[in-house]
């Protein structure tokens, strides 16, 4: 019951005072299934893109982290091109004090500052390390094409 109350508060807070760069809502009034959008950060190759993701919240939240997957295609070393899975430190260092908004904030930060040393897409990570201009060009093209 405590998890239910906490999730209710988190979604209520997000709906009442959403950050300017993201939004979230429940899917079919199910507290354990959310949809979220994150705007690409200014100055990044993802700028002007709006990226959607699914959030699945486990029954033992907040003791276990939520699972987030991009549903918008994105060219990024830490996001799996085929299924939108995300590799971010927040999932491996999860603590019950963290909230869904903290996870969304972390995901937005990896759009600005990818971690090519812990990739899900090794070729994209290699390009990010060795040819940043080509990486930025492709990431901008994908953003324009998919993140409308």
Curated annotation (Swiss-Prot):
Its EC number is 2.3.2.23. It catalyses: S-ubiquitinyl-[E1 ubiquitin-activating enzyme]-L-cysteine + [E2 ubiquitin-conjugating enzyme]-L-cysteine = [E1 ubiquitin-activating enzyme]-L-cysteine + S-ubiquitinyl-[E2 ubiquitin-conjugating enzyme]-L-cysteine. One of its GO terms (biological process) is anatomical structure morphogenesis. It comes from the Eukaryota. The keyword Transmembrane helix does not apply. GO terms for cellular component: nucleus. Involved in protein ubiquitination and degradation during development. Mediates protein ubiquitination at the mound and finger stage required for subsequent development and may be an essential component of the developmental transition between the induction of postaggregative gene expression and subsequent cell-type differentiation and morphogenesis. ubcB and ubpB differentially control ubiquitination/deubiquitination and degradation of mkkA protein in a cell-type-specific and temporally regulated manner. Disruption phenotype: The developmental pattern of protein ubiquitination is altered in null cells. Null cells are blocked in the ability to properly execute the developmental transition that occurs between the induction of postaggregative gene expression during mound formation and the induction of cell-type differentiation and subsequent morphogenesis. Null cells plated on agar form mounds with normal kinetics; however, they remain at this stage for 10 hours before forming multiple tips and fingers that then arrest. Pathway: Protein modification; protein ubiquitination. GO terms for molecular function: ubiquitin conjugating enzyme activity; ubiquitin-protein transferase activity. This is Ubiquitin conjugating enzyme E2 B. Residues 2-148 form the UBC core domain. The keyword Transferase applies. It comes from Dictyostelium discoideum (Social amoeba). InterPro entries: UBQ-conjugat_E2_core, UBQ-conjugating_enzyme/RWD. Interacts with mkkA (via F-box/WD40 repeat domains). Belongs to the ubiquitin-conjugating enzyme family. Keywords: Transferase, Ubl conjugation pathway. The active site is at residue 87.
């Amino acid at each position: 019951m405590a998890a239910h109350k906490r999730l209710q508060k988190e979604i209520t807070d997000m709906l009442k005072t959403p950050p300017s760069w993201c939004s979230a809502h429940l899917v079919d009034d199910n507290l354990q299934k959310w949809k979220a959008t994150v705007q690409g950060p200014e100055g990044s190759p993802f700028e002007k893109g709006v990226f959607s993701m699914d959030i699945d919240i486990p029954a033992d939240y907040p003791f276990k982290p939520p699972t987030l997957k991009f549903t918008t295609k994105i060219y990024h070393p830490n996001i799996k091109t085929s299924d939108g899975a995300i590799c971010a430190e927040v999932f491996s260092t999860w603590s019950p004090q963290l909230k869904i908004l903290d996870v969304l904030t972390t995901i937005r930060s990896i759009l600005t500052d990818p971690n090519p040393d812990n990739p899900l897409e090794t070729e994209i990570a290699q390009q990010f390390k060795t040819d940043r201009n080509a990486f930025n060009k492709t990431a901008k093209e994908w953003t324009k094409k998919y993140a409308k």
